[in-house]
């Protein structure tokens, strides 16, 4: 019963995505719809008392009923013979419909349970996958895109690791990103990203397919995660690679091993050993916290199409097709046709992330309803 309801809800979303109509969450909230029935059970019917435990939700539900009643009354004036009155009614109807849409959006935001980590900062990790040098070049472009997106959102972006390839690409990199709701926006970026294009070195014009992987790790506070110093082994060594004279003269690189789990965190980005130790600990804390959340997250998202956590990291989530100037997110069947602008990491990326958030909210609502039925 529940799985069938979820499948039906996904087909509804898919049809809306193809037709570019508004998200169906509002349709679920229509009078007589399943979400409306759930809402009335949650806050109480008009005849009964409203739930004092949800005052904001109760107030919004009451106002929605009033506005819908006002809309029905105003629509009846459209049949009046007085043209001035009909024009006034049309204006009032447009305003009323706008207010109803805003109220539904407000109710949905109050109904959808917030995740504990949504307000957290995060660790971004990018790693080249299949495709050799082309995969490394794409990984570098993706890292730049996320750095530009952080600037667009006015978040703090700090590079923790950066391992370039010999020909200008990027093997692996990580960064700390902090700002209002940073994790809430970025959490669905984790997974396998596929690029299709003709490499600059390709003489016959053949399209190559390469991949890279993005991991998004919520960054815990000191209160949420306590690490026993006895569980850590901290080693220092000389940094390798580019970096100036300090590479061969200073033991600035830091390697931290969490003995109970075997998780390793390294950093040699900075000249200061203390700074590298701080950054390595930041990454270690994020990985331990992410591992702790995996079991809970897997249960919570087991029935969802959009995955968060390790399961999501192995899933191909998006294709960047340069010959077609198209980026497609496979989870919500949405395509955008301005790839160059998308890679700038501003409005188009933000729009796609908002669509993913909308779909996630939609699945949350559908699951909420199906559990109650």
Curated annotation (Swiss-Prot):
<keyword id="KW-0488">Methylation</keyword>
<comment type="similarity">
    <text>Belongs to the prokaryotic/mitochondrial release factor family.</text>
</comment>
<dbReference type="InterPro" id="IPR050057">
    <property type="entry name" value="Prokaryotic/Mito_RF"/>
</dbReference>
<dbReference type="InterPro" id="IPR045853">
    <property type="entry name" value="Pep_chain_release_fac_I_sf"/>
</dbReference>
<feature type="coiled-coil region">
    <location>
        <begin position="56"/>
        <end position="111"/>
    </location>
</feature>
<dbReference type="InterPro" id="IPR005139">
    <property type="entry name" value="PCRF"/>
</dbReference>
<dbReference type="Pfam" id="PF03462">
    <property type="entry name" value="PCRF"/>
</dbReference>
<dbReference type="GO" id="GO:0070126">
    <property type="term" value="P:mitochondrial translational termination"/>
</dbReference>
<feature type="region of interest" description="GGQ domain">
    <location>
        <begin position="229"/>
        <end position="293"/>
    </location>
</feature>
<feature type="transit peptide" description="Mitochondrion">
    <location>
        <begin position="1"/>
        <end position="13"/>
    </location>
</feature>
<keyword id="KW-0809">Transit peptide</keyword>
<feature type="short sequence motif" description="GGQ">
    <location>
        <begin position="243"/>
        <end position="245"/>
    </location>
</feature>
<dbReference type="GO" id="GO:0005739">
    <property type="term" value="C:mitochondrion"/>
</dbReference>
<dbReference type="InterPro" id="IPR000352">
    <property type="entry name" value="Pep_chain_release_fac_I"/>
</dbReference>
<keyword id="KW-0175">Coiled coil</keyword>
<dbReference type="GO" id="GO:0003747">
    <property type="term" value="F:translation release factor activity"/>
</dbReference>
<dbReference type="Pfam" id="PF00472">
    <property type="entry name" value="RF-1"/>
</dbReference>
<comment type="function">
    <text>Mitochondrial peptide chain release factor that directs the termination of translation in response to the peptide chain termination codons UAA and UAG.</text>
</comment>
<protein>
    <recommendedName>
        <fullName>Peptide chain release factor 1-like, mitochondrial</fullName>
    </recommendedName>
</protein>
<keyword id="KW-0496">Mitochondrion</keyword>
<feature type="modified residue" description="N5-methylglutamine">
    <location>
        <position position="245"/>
    </location>
</feature>
<keyword id="KW-0648">Protein biosynthesis</keyword>
<dbReference type="GO" id="GO:0016149">
    <property type="term" value="F:translation release factor activity, codon specific"/>
</dbReference>
């Amino acid at each position: 019963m529940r799985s069938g309801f979820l499948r039906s809800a996904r087909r509804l979303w898919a049809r809306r995505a193809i037709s570019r109509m508004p998200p169906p969450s509002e349709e679920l909230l229509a009078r007589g719809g399943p979400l409306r029935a759930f809402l009335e059970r949650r806050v109480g019917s008009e005849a009964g008392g409203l739930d004092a435990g949800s005052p904001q939700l109760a107030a919004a539900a009451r106002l929605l009923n009033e506005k819908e009643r006002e809309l029905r009354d105003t629509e009846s004036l459209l049949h009046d013979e007085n043209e001035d009155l009909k024009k006034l009614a049309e204006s009032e109807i447009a305003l009323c419909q706008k207010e109803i849409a805003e109220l539904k959006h407000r109710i949905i935001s109050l109904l959808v349970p917030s995740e504990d980590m949504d307000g957290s900062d995060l660790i971004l990790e990018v790693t080249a996958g299949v495709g050799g040098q082309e995969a490394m070049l794409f990984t570098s472009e993706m890292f730049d895109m996320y750095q530009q997106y952080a600037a667009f959102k006015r978040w703090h972006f700090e590079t923790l690791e950066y391992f370039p390839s010999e020909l200008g690409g990027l093997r692996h990199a990580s960064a700390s990103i902090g700002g209002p709701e940073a994790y809430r926006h970025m959490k669905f970026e984790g997974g396998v990203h596929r690029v299709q294009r003709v490499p600059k070195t390709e003489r016959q014009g053949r399209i190559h397919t390469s991949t890279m992987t993005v991991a998004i790790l919520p960054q815990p506070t000191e209160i949420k995660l306590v690490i026993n110093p006895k569980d850590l082994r901290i080693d220092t060594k000389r940094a390798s690679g580019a970096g100036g004279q300090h590479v061969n003269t200073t033991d600035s690189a830091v390697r931290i091993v969490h003995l109970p789990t075997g998780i390793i965190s390294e950093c040699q980005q900075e000249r200061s050993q203390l700074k590298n130790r701080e950054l390595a600990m930041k990454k270690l804390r994020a990985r331990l916290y992410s591992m702790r959340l995996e079991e809970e997250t897997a249960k919570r998202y087991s029935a969802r199409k959009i995955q968060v956590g390790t399961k999501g990291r192995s899933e191909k989530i998006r294709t960047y097709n340069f010959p077609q100037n198209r980026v497609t997110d496979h989870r919500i069947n949405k395509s955008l046709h301005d790839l160059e602008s998308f890679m700038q990491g501003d409005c188009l990326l933000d729009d796609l992330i908002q669509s993913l958030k909308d779909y996630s909210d939609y699945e949350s609502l559908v699951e909420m309803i199906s559990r109650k039925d």
